[in-house]
């Protein structure tokens, strides 16, 4: 049995007030996580800040990961924009990572009340690409 570790230190781990690692720090931490054998390293949210964009640019040329795959993190498109017009979706594409983690509203309450959209379930057959979809329930 193989267990894949999906590490969120470079994004979620730095959300505490007063913690703001440099791009160099994030690159070094990514190397350490790779050396530990972590399977996936969530690098951050490209488009959230120029520093995040710089991290992904430098990671492309400076990180030679032996074990891990770098993952960019972002959200679904804004309800009022098509995906090709949404700057967040474009930032995910510009990060040029092999893997992307996309967070989106999945509870009926969030969909109908928070973003005031309708619930639509779409079932698809497996795609020819390796697409993994997992759902983690929110606390609300």
List PLM regions with ranges.
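Short, acidic/polar
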Residues: 23-30, 85-89
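Conserved small/polar residues in nucleotide/adenosyl-binding loops
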Residues: 123-128
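Acidic (Asp/Glu)-rich catalytic clusters
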Residues: 59-65, 89-97
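Active-site mouth loops of central-metabolism enzymes
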Residues: 10-24, 74-82, 113-119
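Glycine-rich, proline-tolerant flexible connector loops at the mouths of alpha/beta enzymes
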Residues: 39-60, 105-115
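Catalytic domains of carbohydrate-active enzymes, especially glycoside hydrolases
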Residues: 28-41
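Hydrophobic faces of well-ordered beta-strands that scaffold small-molecule active sites
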Residues: 5-8, 41-43, 68-74, 100-102
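N-terminal small/glycine-rich loop or linker at the start of catalytic domains
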Residues: 1-18, 101-114
